[in-house]
């Protein structure tokens, strides 16, 4: 019998119930997926920078951060900044959430796969998207050189951002013109990594599920 894969769900504090509901151990009547017997660790984004204390019944001081097969990051745009901690006058450095996630969870221990969930992956510019994708690649800029023909993620998204910036400054701009000017590799990246679901799409194709779990406000 194969051992169960170790999975971590990272989410904002306010979304805790969205995830713990589907844990089989809680045996919740609201769990429509109870037969799947889901088991995973649920933590907050802020728990990444806590070395002690509890989250639910989890002792943060005893977590083996490098032992997760899968990390699901809800509201992943909260990790759009790739800031790293700075040393103080005593030479000590406190890791940022981004640094803790990429260094201690994704790059340490076993091979970790990452799933990002976000309705707004880009807040400022395409560097937001780049930094989130780096969580998937463990910071490797050339990770898609063979699979998608993208030798440098950073270079591609910078080039794409430059095209968008110039296009946005034109008064009579149209979206078709932008699409024709963006690098073809940009669309290869989106096709290879993303699954997009709009509210309209969900309401049309997942009506039965919405009837069970609740509709959009």
Regions found by a protein language model. Give the residues of each.
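Inter-lobe coupling linker of SF2 helicases/translocases
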Residues: 37-79, 83-121, 128, 138-217
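CheY-like receiver
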Residues: 21, 131-134, 155
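Conserved nucleic-acid-binding Ia/Ib motif block in the N-terminal RecA-like helicase ATPase lobe
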Residues: 17-42
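Post-Walker A helix-loop "phosphate-sensing" segment adjacent to the P-loop in P-loop NTPases
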Residues: 2-4, 136-141
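Conserved Walker A/P-loop ATP-binding site and its immediately adjacent core
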Residues: 1-25, 121-129
